[in-house]
Curated annotation (Swiss-Prot):
Belongs to the UPF0178 family. It comes from Ruegeria pomeroyi (strain ATCC 700808 / DSM 15171 / DSS-3) (Silicibacter pomeroyi). This is UPF0178 protein SPO3827. Pfam families: DUF188.
Amino acid sequence: MTTLYVDADACPVRAEAERVATRHRLRMAVVSNGGLRPSQNPLVETVIVPDGPDVADQWIAERAGRGDVVITADIPLAAKCVEAGARVLRHNGEAFTPANIGQQLAMRDLMADLRAANPLGAGGGGKPFSKADRARFLDALEREIRAAQRDAQG
């Protein structure tokens, strides 16, 4: 059975993911190291993991596999889940796939090196999350859930 895993730290689409999971009658695991209000939805499990680096990511990576969908912005977690056969989306609807995950990891490492080389440089952060991003995410999640359900059937 398909499970939707949400890496809940700084995830702006938890409510949307829950609505889609409910519509498809999917189990959903919302994983964080704390600070979340549990959902009253019986299909949604709120998983609170111990504090520590990458503990939530490890919890998801140990469980996600073929036939599942993972929502995360964490590229190393995405790589582990893609390798395990799961379908993986960023919260803006961009899919991590076997075809692009290597490039995504390389770009992440390059950007980390550039930030380390210029510790006084301006951070800037990412662009604000828009309605278009939300719509793109919802379309992509519908598509990936259907594909994951086909994957789970064989």
